[in-house]
C-alpha cells in the first residue's frame, strides 16, 4: 500500500516503529560515530562537516545538524525546489556530507520539487563519496484535493545514475 502511494519498489520499503525525525537523527548519529557504508571514516573524525540547508526550511531538521556541530550552509528555495546552481557548486566541496529536503509540500513554503530538480539531485556528482540527502517525504499524501502529488522514485533515479545510496528516504 505505502510503496504504491509513494511510487517506490516495495523491496525498498521498511515499516518502522519510530518517528521519522528519530530515524533521521539515528542515521546522522550513526554516520557521525561510525561513518556510513560509503564513508572513508566517521564524520566525527572530519575536520569540518557541512550540511546543505534549504531556506526557509524545517527547524527540527536544522536542530539535528546543529546538535552535531555541523556547519549549516543555506541554499535558497525557489518555486521549483532548492537553487540547484548553488547546490551543485556546494557539493564540489568534500566537507559537504548531506542535505535536508522536504520534496512534496515542503515545510514551510509548500513547494513541491520539480522533476528536473529531483533528477539533478539524483544525478549530481559530489566530492564526498558518503554524501546523503535526507528525503523527508512526510507530506507525500497530504493534499487538499483528490489528486495526489507526483512522488518520483528517487531510489531508482539515484541507482540509474550510479548513486544508489544517495537518499535516506523517510
Predicted feature descriptions by range:
Residues 133-134:
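Residue-level marker for buried hydrophobic side chains located in beta-strands
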Residues 1-129, 141-162:
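Conserved core of the PLP fold type I
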Residues 166-169:
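Donor nucleotide-activated moiety binding/catalytic core segment of transferases
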Amino acid at each position: 500500500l505505502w510503496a504504491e502511494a509513494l511510487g517506490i519498489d516495495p523491496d525498498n520499503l521498511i515499516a518502522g516503529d519510530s518517528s521519522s525525525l528519530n530515524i533521521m537523527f539515528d542515521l546522522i548519529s550513526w554516520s557521525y560515530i561510525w561513518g556510513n557504508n560509503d564513508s572513508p571514516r566517521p564524520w566525527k573524525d572530519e575536520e569540518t562537516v557541512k550540511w546543505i540547508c534549504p531556506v526557509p526550511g524545517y527547524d527540527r531538521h536544522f536542530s539535528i545538524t546543529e546538535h552535531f556541530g555541523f556547519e549549516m550552509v543555506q541554499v535558497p528555495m525557489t518555486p521549483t525546489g532548492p537553487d540547484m546552481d548553488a547546490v551543485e557548486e556546494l557539493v564540489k566541496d568534500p566537507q559537504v556530507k548531506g542535505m535536508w529536503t522536504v520534496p512534496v509540500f515542503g515545510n514551510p513554503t509548500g513547494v513541491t520539487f520539480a522533476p528536473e530538480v529531483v533528477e539533478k539531485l539524483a544525478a549530481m556528482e559530489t566530492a564526498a563519496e558518503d554524501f546523503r540527502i535526507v528525503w523527508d517525504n512526510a507530506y507525500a499524501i497530504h493534499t487538499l484535493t483528490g489528486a495526489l502529488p507526483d512522488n518520483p522514485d528517487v531510489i531508482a533515479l539515484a541507482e540509474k545514475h550510479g548513486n544508489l545510496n544517495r537518499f535516506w528516504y523517510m
